[in-house]
């Protein structure tokens, strides 16, 4: 159950970094359209972060959380994400990606005590085909809600 008093705490993750791409555009569009007054929004910066995007997110009143590279320091990234979720008592994790490697964020959410874990698919293919196939059965069990940018992305 989400917190009744105070602001809801939401962490948003782009698995490809905060760069000029479709995922970041969707995240920014959502943040710009939402009433953020009843939420504390944390946006994870990993892999790469364009400074102008970081500034846009901060100008909306959101917090940027710097974490190790998801690509090169995956375990360290996952541990720090889990700790942050637990310490901040995050209500919702909304992770954007292209494959079942979103398992990393969904597992961090579960282990961190986050009740609402949203996996958001942005594509119908991925670069990590082997990891995707291996992680997919676990992935299906970890998220509580799933979004997609289109019908094909949702079916994939």
Model regions: which residues?
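Membrane-interface segments of envelope glycosyltransferases acting on lipid-linked substrates or membrane lipids
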Residues: 1-156
């Amino acid at each position: 159950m989400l917190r009744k008093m105070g602001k809801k705490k939401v962490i948003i993750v782009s698995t490809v970094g905060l760069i000029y791409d479709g995922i970041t555009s969707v995240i920014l569009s959502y943040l710009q359209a939402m009433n953020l007054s009843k939420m504390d929004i944390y946006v994870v910066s990993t892999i790469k972060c364009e400074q102008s995007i970081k500034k846009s997110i901060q100008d909306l009143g959101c917090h940027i959380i710097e974490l190790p590279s998801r690509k090169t320091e995956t375990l360290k990234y996952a541990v720090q994400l889990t700790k942050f979720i637990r310490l901040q008592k995050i209500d919702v994790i909304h992770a954007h990606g292209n494959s079942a490697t979103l398992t990393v964020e969904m597992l961090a959410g579960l282990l961190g005590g986050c009740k609402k874990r949203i996996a958001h698919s942005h594509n119908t293919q991925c670069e990590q085909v082997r990891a995707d196939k291996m992680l997919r059965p676990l992935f299906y069990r970890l998220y509580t809600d799933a979004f997609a940018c289109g019908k094909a992305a949702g079916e994939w």
